[in-house]
């Protein structure tokens, strides 16, 4: 059977509560950190159902000023064991892996990293917290970050709009 013959079908019941996230979202945000100058960025975020009990997550961002690539993330959003619970597993090209746990309830998805992995040359991130507010075809979000030398502080804020389902 070829890839073209595979039918994704309907979302399984276990992930139906994640349906409001499905699609490709594009927007802009503002970033900063004590160790860097503030910056404005564009972003493309995709939550895609690939036929199983999870969603695939893909993110890429770029500087609005000149289009320079900034960041990429790839991973999976899965249901947890309790109603509304979610688990996010991500790989970052900065030499990091992230496992976050949280909830998606009434359009609010809040996640806290419970495990961070790092390569020998990976960025010294020790904590991440993500907050998403889903309102129809718009998502507003915030990301807080802690490193070995900086406590948890706001790093990114942005807003994306669904451009395809």
Label each region the model flagged:
Residues 64-103:
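Helix-adjacent hinge/juxtasegments
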